[in-house]
Amino acid sequence: MTDTNDRMTKLQTMHQRAPDDTFLIYAIAMEHKKLGQLSQAIEWLGRVVEKDPTYCAAYHQAALTHEESGDLEAAKKWYRDGIAAAGRKGDTHTMGEMQAALAAIE
């Protein structure tokens, strides 16, 4: 078993024990992204924001992952939603990063 598979197995096991832990869900998403499994990464990032609509990093990573897969329209939507979430949360730094990224693809 490779280190990456071992990490994914451990994350999945922890997730079974704590299914509402958004950090674990985010970690699983990022592991999928690292493996090049972009659609799975996006699915898991969607789960993060379903559980915590203020988890700004999930919006940003979902947008970046959509960009990587070539779906710029979906990326724009994730950026816009993330900018709104960051604004509600008062996270001006992340909001600025996503605004700049959105401007770069519009």
What are these regions (language model features)?
Residues 13-14, 47-48, 82:
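Canonical positions in the second alpha-helix
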Residues 17, 50-51, 68, 85-89:
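Structural marker of alpha-solenoid helical repeat scaffolds
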